[in-house]
Amino acid sequence: MPEPQNQEELDKYLDNIITQAEKRLDKVFASRLKEIKAMINKLFEKYSKNGELTYADVVKYNRLEKEMDVIKQNISADYKTVLKMLNELLETQYVDNYLRSAYIYEMYTGRNLGFSVPSADVVQRAVENPIPLLTLPKVLERQRVELINNIAMAIAQGLMAGEGYSQVAQRVHKRMQLSLAKARLTARTEGHRVQVAGRMASAEQAAKKVNMQKMWSAALDTRTRAGHRKLDGKIINMDENFKSIYGGVGKAPGHMHMAKDDCNCRCALIYVIDGEIPSVRRARLSDGSTRVIKYIPYTEWEKQKKAS
């Protein structure tokens, strides 16, 4: 991918990094699911009678408990991997957006704006969620415990219902997919929050020497939530807050302190230098691809879509 030359291109570049992280999560969960299915198949092969395996058969001699101990250890190791993976993602999102935004501001203004590489302490403070219960380790720990309990329950319920291997494996598959979806949502939501934090920090430094305002830029497609469509194109001063119809109030997308605003938000924060808004923006087509169009607010784009 070519080097980003403006804030729109930079957002696409950073979003692609999050997408790649989501794909790595897919591989972690797919590998674990494959091993758990193999374990279930082994139980059926060793202890079933005429293809039927009862719950009593697997609890005898702690057979299921021993297998669940192994599953618990393996899933715990997986979540340590996920935590490391997501911490690296968040650090990349912050530092990349900070430095690349700094480059864009300096190239645009033709001035040295006094930027330096953020220290490890600054990055760590930015990465950590300010709400104690929503820090990455605590969120992933809740997801880990939930997944282990759900797998144990899925196997037990399937066997007590007299189901065969395929049905029990399908129960486990559904539980794993739900946990994967939560892990992906965590990566997307936290990645976006820290990504925007990097740009805000960069803009605060630039604003010491140039006139800057901030503008909400909604994702230009039909999946954008109604409240964020209304905020699209809204320009406010650096020290002001955005307010959404959902009750969120905050400095930027992903920082509205309201789950209905922040979870899986795809909006961007664009900085307006000397009152000049971007001339182009990226829109998503019906086939999922994107293209660059002349800058128009979301409401105007929506009218054009309905008329076409």
Swiss-Prot record:
The lineage's top-level taxon is Viruses
| Compartments reported by the entry | Virion
Which InterPro entries does the protein's record reference? Phage_head_morphogenesis_dom
Q: Which UniProt keywords apply?
A: Capsid protein, DNA-binding, Late protein, Virion
Q: Pull one GO CC term from this UniProt entry.
A: viral procapsid
Please provide, alphabetically and separated by semicolons, the GO molecular function terms listed in this UniProt record: DNA binding
What is this protein's function per UniProt? Answer: Binds the viral DNA inside the capsid and the portal protein. May control the DNA exit from the virion.
Q: How does it assemble?
A: Monomer. Interacts with the portal protein gp6; this interaction targets gp7 to the procapsid portal vertex.
What is the recorded name of this protein?
Minor head protein GP7
